[in-house]
Amino acid sequence: MCQMSDLDNVNANTTHLVIGDNCLNDASLESLSFSPLRYLREVTIGDNSLSRLKILSIEDLEALRKVTVGASSCYQDFETVDRTADYLLRLKNDPVLKEVKIGVISFAYFDRPLFENLFSLEKIEMGSMDPTVLSGNFYNALFSLTG
């Protein structure tokens, strides 16, 4: 999936969703929810994608097991970021979600990450494991994991 028109054609029975590298960077795409895709088991977002997004909602998905976000996705550069907006990532009520991986600089300006009621979560990996690399995830946020 890479074009805005692809979003309209996602089958409700989809189990694996892949957004490629450098995709869905249209200025009109400010909010995205995967909640209508009730059978989704895995979400993969490539590098440098969803660059204008302000809200990403991954909620109430009873089959979701894994979320992977590449580098510099859901990232606005200094010139395009809206400093008056709230940037929100919601991972909530996904009862079998086991793993979340987020690449370097992704969600840098997202100031409201919410990870809630993820009872099967075993692994959260953010940024680089190399201590010399600035990860920059949720740079201005207070991060909390509840439930």
Describe the residue ranges of each PLM region.
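Low-complexity, intrinsically disordered short peptide segments enriched in small/polar/basic residues
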Residues: 7, 16, 93, 97-102, ...
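Conserved hydrophobic beta-strand positions in leucine-rich repeat
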Residues: 17-19, 32, 43, 56, ...
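Leucine-rich repeat
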Residues: 3-10, 30-36, 56-58, 87-92, ...
